[in-house]
Amino acid sequence: MNHRFILLAFFCIQIVFGQSFGKNKVQYRDFDWKFIKSPHFDVYYYANEFELAEFTANAAEEAYEQISIHLRWTLKKPVSVIVYNSHNDFQQTNVVDTYMSEGIGGVTELFKNRVVLPFDGSYKEFRHVIHHELVHAVINDMIYGGNIQGIISGRIRLNIPLW
């Protein structure tokens, strides 16, 4: 009986890992990136989306103000926020290796603590996603010192609570 259960569990796990197999990240075009700076963020954008980049920088600063108060933490260095004009362009990102399905509204990359966001046309939803992803970025800064490279090189000691 136990052997059947183990065999069934093994095949179920293989099915879960097989969902992303064969999904390639195709990059249809090259992006001409520009960026603007705010006190705590470097916002990268492309095409003629300066207004979207300004909105992103302002929304990020507003969100950071709330997050830093709630978590009692200030960022050690500016966080890069990469903004794509559409979800189709967002799916081409090479910041993370994972295929970005339609349901993903943004991602915070741990290695360099970068936030990657697609703009879907709704400023209200975009502001919400910016806030959500910046919570991840601030927590990464709290735990890993801004990037995981410091832990790998041994420069940062983890002081995780032992609850």
Predicted regions and their residues:
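Juxtacatalytic substrate-recognition/specificity segment
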Residues: 18-159
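Bacterial Sec-dependent N-terminal signal peptides
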Residues: 1-26
